């Protein structure tokens, strides 16, 4: 599923961000692959992928639709967090995305960008861990 969503995103971006049959087919294949993996019946997969909110047609496919379905497929997987950071937590990409109610007050209203070093790292390798420490809201180099 993940590979198909990556393919859909690449095909869309290669076409200037415009929907096209290759991107659309990969998007639908990603949805089907994920639903099959989690045990959804063929009839329910067909019903879901036939829903007008999903079956938008090749020319109407957007990056938002691809990333939204990829997020569902990868929920609780670190790659989903990578996509959120790649797209700067955009609620244009993931409509309705907002900071959680009990957001970490140390982040001062900013999204988390990196994980903290584990205690084992700071206790066993404190010189390097403290030298390379960045606040959790500082973007990693790859997302700048």
Predicted region positions:
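Acidic/polar-rich alpha-helix caps and helix-coil junctions
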Residues: 1-144
């Amino acid at each position: 599923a993940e590979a198909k969503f990556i393919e859909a995103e690449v095909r869309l971006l290669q076409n200037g961000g415009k929907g096209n049959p290759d991107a659309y087919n990969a998007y639908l294949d990603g949805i089907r692959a994920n639903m099959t993996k989690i045990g959804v019946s063929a009839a329910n997969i067909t019903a879901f992928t036939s829903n007008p909110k999903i079956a938008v047609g090749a020319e109407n496919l957007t990056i938002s639709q691809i990333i939204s379905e990829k997020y569902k497929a990868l929920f609780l997987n670190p790659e989903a967090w990578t996509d959120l950071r790649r797209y700067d937590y955009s609620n244009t990409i993931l409509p309705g995305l907002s900071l959680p109610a009990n957001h970490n007050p140390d982040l001062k209203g900013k999204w988390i960008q990196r994980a903290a070093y584990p205690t084992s790292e700071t206790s066993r390798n404190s010189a390097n861990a403290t030298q390379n420490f960045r606040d959790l809201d500082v973007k990693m180099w790859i997302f700048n």
